[in-house]
């Protein structure tokens, strides 16, 4: 994975994804519509830029800063990120896609 990865949704899964990406030396942009204290502390600990509550019109610019996007569970299908990612041709993954990518076990 190269470039910057935008992680949307910084609950338990999103924070774990950010941590895993940072451990693999991937640049991360964390985004949450309503980040809590724990999400802010995690972003600070990982030295990840955190964007809080972006307006709907901000998504094309945010997605344009990323080479890929990882969405946490619970992000609704109608979230403006999806339209922005499609328009920009940016791949959207979830945590299981990311895990499969990193799984180096032999395949049958």
Regions found by a protein language model. Give the residues of each.
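N-terminal leader/targeting and accessory segments in enzymes
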Residues: 1-98
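Walker A (P-loop) phosphate-binding motif
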Residues: 95-108
């Amino acid at each position: 994975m190269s470039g910057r990865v935008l992680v949307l949704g910084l609950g338990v899964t999103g924070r774990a994804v950010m941590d895993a990406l940072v451990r693999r030396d991937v640049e991360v942009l964390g985004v949450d519509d309503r980040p809590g204290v724990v999400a802010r502390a995690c972003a600070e600990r990982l030295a990840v830029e955190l964007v809080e509550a972006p307006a709907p019109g901000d998504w094309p610019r945010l997605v344009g800063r990323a080479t890929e996007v990882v969405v946490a569970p619970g992000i609704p299908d109608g979230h403006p990120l999806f339209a922005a990612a499609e328009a920009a041709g940016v791949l959207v993954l979830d945590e299981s896609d990311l895990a499969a990518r990193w799984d180096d076990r032999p395949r049958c």
